[in-house]
Amino acid sequence: MIHELPKLPYALNALEPYISERTLEFHYGKHHQAYVTNLNKLITGTEYENSSLEDIIRKAGGGIFNNGAQVWNHTFYWNCMKPKRGGEPTGKLADILVKNFGSFAEFKEKFSTAAATLFGSGWAWLVKKSDGSLVITQESNAGNPLKTGDHPILTCDVWEHAYYLDKQNLRPGYIADFWNLLDWDAIAGRL
């Protein structure tokens, strides 16, 4: 199976002023594409040659896992955002966040802290556990909750390439801007 760079669900400049077109040109067009290219090279002639990204994440290790997970993680991340979104969730998602975290404000603070305090590169995730509870996790590097059987709901990419052109070393500023882009309808659809 040849993996391809999926089309972004919006134009490269659509997330401005929060994420610049220049950042997306590099983040999506260079970094995400490189993970796809590297994955295809690595799986050729292996047991993973015809595997889905999900199977690669659950079963592979090393470079195949790293590149496969990064392809999946980035696609998931792009689909967490939409131009002119943000605000707060409503309905079932809002109720579940209150049940699990006390309030939306508490959830937002805990998720932001997890994203800001992750040492080095990686991802902050909101995941649904097998018992139905929602938890916030930190995954270093290419970490992905599918590997441990969790169900991803939301992610924030905290690799420096996600924000360095716009925010330099100010990761918390990038995280604050991230909240202005969240597509709560898409996120709620993952419950």
Where are the regions a protein language model picked out?
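Feature for soluble, non-membrane regions of globular proteins
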Residues: 1-191
